[in-house]
């Protein structure tokens, strides 16, 4: 028989202590607090993708070359980065895979995204006859690898204002867009580009499918951002580079 004193005191279940709220990384916090400048432009070199599915890798290479002048533009590097970035996605490169490939090579990375799961990749997987369980396992694996490298993610919508804030905070945005919205002769598909800057005339974009930097009106660029309502932006700190990690990744 239960002790009556204990019964009274235990009638109300003890509440579990709440975990402290997760603090945003210094990189993401810096962007959040940044004041938008009149213009912000970085001299990021252009690199054209070698295949129709390697825009993620080509975009990563442009950022890596900006951060590390010793980094070489080579097809071998492009396909190596693509193999890592494609983990958790179908062909084009996942946000976690791309972030992981960059961080592994010395970049300091953050992610802004409005989705928490595989998103449109589930539909593409069915179209490409990729097993959904395999896709989910790959997605979760690369997500954990990204977390292990200290990559943090903020849930939010990628807008032209968010991109301006990122650039104003001295970070380099790699943004997911719809290929058809930026190249009318291409089919609608997920495509990654590097936004090197903006001024009163518009945004300057290193599109790996093009031969050089292109300029886009803010309203036109706004319509291009994201694919099937999924929005991802990989953010690299323009002033941080870990040479030791870069050397170890070779």
State the predicted function of each range.
Residues 2-148, 156-158, 186, 199, ...:
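Active-site-adjacent structural segments surrounding the nucleophilic cysteine of cysteine proteases
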Residues 98-99, 160-164, 193, 222:
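Short amphipathic alpha-helical segments and helix-helix/interface helices
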Residues 18-32, 86, 167-168, 174, ...:
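Noncatalytic regulatory segments and standalone regulatory/sensor domains
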Residues 138-177, 181:
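Internal catalytic-core helix/loop-beta-alpha segment
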């Amino acid at each position: 028989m239960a002790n009556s004193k204990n019964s009274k005191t235990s009638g109300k279940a003890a509440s579990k202590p709440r975990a402290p709220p997760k603090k945003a990384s210094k990189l993401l916090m810096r962007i959040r607090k940044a004041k938008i400048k009149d213009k912000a432009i970085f001299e990021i070199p252009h690199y054209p993708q070698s295949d129709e599915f390697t825009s993620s890798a080509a975009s990563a290479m442009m950022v890596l070359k900006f951060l590390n002048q010793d980094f070489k533009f080579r097809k071998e590097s492009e396909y190596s980065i693509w193999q890592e970035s494609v983990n958790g996605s179908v062909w084009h490169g996942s946000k976690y895979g791309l972030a992981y490939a960059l961080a592994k090579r010395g970049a300091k990375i953050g992610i802004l995204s409005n989705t928490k799961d595989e998103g449109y990749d589930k539909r593409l997987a069915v179209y490409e006859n990729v097993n959904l369980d395999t896709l989910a396992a790959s997605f979760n694996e690369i997500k954990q690898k990204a977390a292990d490298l200290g990559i943090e993610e903020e849930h939010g919508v990628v807008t032209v204002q968010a991109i301006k804030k990122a650039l104003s905070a001295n970070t380099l945005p790699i943004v997911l867009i719809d290929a058809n919205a930026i190249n009318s002769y291409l089919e609608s598909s997920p495509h990654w580009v590097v936004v090197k800057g903006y001024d009163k005339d518009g945004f300057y974009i290193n599109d790996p499918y093009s031969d050089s930097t292109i300029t886009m009106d803010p309203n036109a660029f706004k319509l291009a951002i994201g694919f099937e309502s999924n929005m991802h932006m990989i953010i690299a700190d323009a002033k941080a580079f870990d040479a030791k990690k870069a050397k170890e990744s070779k």
